[in-house]
């Protein structure tokens, strides 16, 4: 893929590879990210996916040339274009494999959506974050479902409306990222997190992601309770569910680690 570097394995890595434009995305990047996460999500050998980037910035949002083209788009063309971006974010968010954003530099605008769509995020302490859209007469509509889930509505009210830049410590405080480290510790921290993802039951991890999507932020009512009851009953009866319990009782490794 022209705009990405992809390394496969138990822990696959998808690297944004446009450092000359601060890894800003355009329609080509969007299509390639969508394809990459779709393919890796279906690969039984892949147990976790790291989203990384080359150069000093993680992602600066939309590519300037792409923005120039968008300025001349009709409403219908803008709808189609926005739908592609929304589809990419949803593909990352619903990827059946756990995803980790490895943030080595600044994150702006649409790049915030990439971070928020991942299950986990590790940032260097030198990274800055900004939802800059209102300064351009726009607003962060497509990324909003993911960013609001990640940072919470209260923080979103502040940073969506003011377009203030904030640092990694603030990103950690509001829940956008899960860990902040020095640049020389970044790879070690990511490597520290991924073994737990690789060693867990593949089916349980996939089903757990679906559970999180179905339960988080929802009202506790009969329908939600029924979903959780059916979920635990189904996974208990699954092959990996049975194997996991038996291996624990027999004090041996489960077959997905054999």
Name the predicted role of every residue range.
Residues 53-91, 107, 219:
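Glycine- (often His-adjacent) and acidic-residue-rich active-site loop
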Residues 1-54, 87-90, 187:
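Conserved CoA-thioester-binding segment of acyl-CoA-metabolizing enzymes
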Residues 1-12, 44, 163-169, 184, ...:
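C-terminal alpha-helix plus adjacent terminal tail
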Residues 30, 61-64, 85, 144, ...:
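A general structural signal for well-ordered alpha-helical segments in protein cores
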């Amino acid at each position: 893929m022209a705009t990405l570097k992809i390394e496969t394995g138990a822990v696959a890595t998808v690297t944004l590879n446009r450092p000359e434009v601060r890894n800003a995305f355009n329609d080509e990047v969007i299509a390639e990210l969508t394809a990459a996460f779709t393919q890796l999500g279906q690969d039984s050998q892949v147990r976790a996916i790291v989203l990384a980037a080359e150069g000093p910035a993680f992602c600066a949002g939309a590519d300037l040339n792409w923005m120039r083209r968008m300025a001349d788009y009709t409403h219908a063309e803008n709808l189609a274009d926005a739908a592609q971006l929304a589809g990419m974010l949803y593909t990352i968010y619903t990827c059946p494999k756990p995803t980790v954003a490895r943030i080595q530099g600044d994150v702006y605008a649409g790049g915030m959506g990439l971070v928020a769509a991942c299950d986990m995020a590790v940032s260097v302490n030198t990274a800055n974050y900004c939802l800059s859209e209102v300064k351009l007469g726009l607003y962060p509509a497509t990324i909003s479902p993911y960013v609001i889930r990640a940072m919470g509505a209260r923080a979103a009210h502040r940073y969506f409306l003011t377009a203030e830049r904030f640092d990694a410590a603030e990103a950690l405080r509001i829940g956008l990222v899960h860990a902040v480290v020095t640049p020389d510790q970044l790879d070690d921290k990511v490597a520290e997190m991924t073994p737990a993802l690789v060693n867990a039951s593949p089916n349980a991890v996939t089903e757990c992601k679906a559970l999180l999507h179905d339960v988080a932020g929802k009202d506790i009512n009969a329908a939600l309770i029924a979903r959780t009851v059916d979920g635990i009953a189904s996974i208990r009866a699954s092959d990996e569910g049975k194997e996991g319990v038996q291996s624990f009782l027999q004090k041996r490794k489960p077959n997905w680690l054999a």
